[in-house]
């Protein structure tokens, strides 16, 4: 099982990625983890990436694709892999195709932006314990206060509505085009490509976790 998981921030990709990886015995691969590991190990690509990052630059797609190809050679990828947060752009997707990185499925978890804003901006956290609440779906017994300690809850900066809207704007402009890219490739094929087109599946990410997980596994069966 080799797949790419697509969806907006707050769509629940992280939760479903964990279930998919457990079911199929595959690793979850993120570019951030790969970069950190390569820099720590001092590999040639890691050294190159560190120079760019230390200078405050963005690591090039060529380096990222090189890291991906190295990562896929590792033994834990023999049964497949799940890409999390990669590719983010059409050029990265094209580079993956040119590098003959095989993908069986592209799975999009679709959640309306209004639902994501409500889901994320309603989160409240007890910092010391990490306990999380939601003002609508999982409220504390007393508004704004942790159930166990009686200490105040906070809204993380990442969960503030303005921040959520900005992240969704970035997704809409940068990553949403991948949805069209992969759905068109899956529908039309491309005889010039070095790899077969993936199957493209779209599921609703609205509902409880069990319902969404059932949709995910159903989509990955055909």
From Swiss-Prot:
GO (cellular component) term, any one: cytoplasm
PROSITE patterns cross-referenced by the UniProt entry: ADENYLATE_KINASE
Annotated region (Disordered), positions in chain: 138-160
Pathway: Purine metabolism; AMP biosynthesis via salvage pathway; AMP from ADP: step 1/1
InterPro entries with a match to the protein in the record: Adenyl_kin_sub (IPR006259), Adenylat/UMP-CMP_kin (IPR000850), Adenylat_kinase_CS (IPR033690), Adenylate_kinase_lid-dom (IPR007862), P-loop_NTPase (IPR027417)
UniProt binding sites for ATP: 10-15, 123, 132-133, 207
Region (LID): 122-159
Record has Hydrolase as a keyword: no
Localization of this protein: Cytoplasm
Major localization listed first in the record, in broad terms: cytoplasm
The entry's keywords: ATP-binding, Cytoplasm, Kinase, Nucleotide biosynthesis, Nucleotide-binding, Transferase
GO MF annotation list: adenylate kinase activity; ATP binding
Residue stretches in coiled coil: none
Region called NMP, residue ranges: 30-59
Subunit structure: Monomer.
Function: Catalyzes the reversible transfer of the terminal phosphate group between ATP and AMP. Plays an important role in cellular energy homeostasis and in adenine nucleotide metabolism.
Name of the protein: Adenylate kinase
Species this protein is from: Ralstonia pickettii (strain 12J)
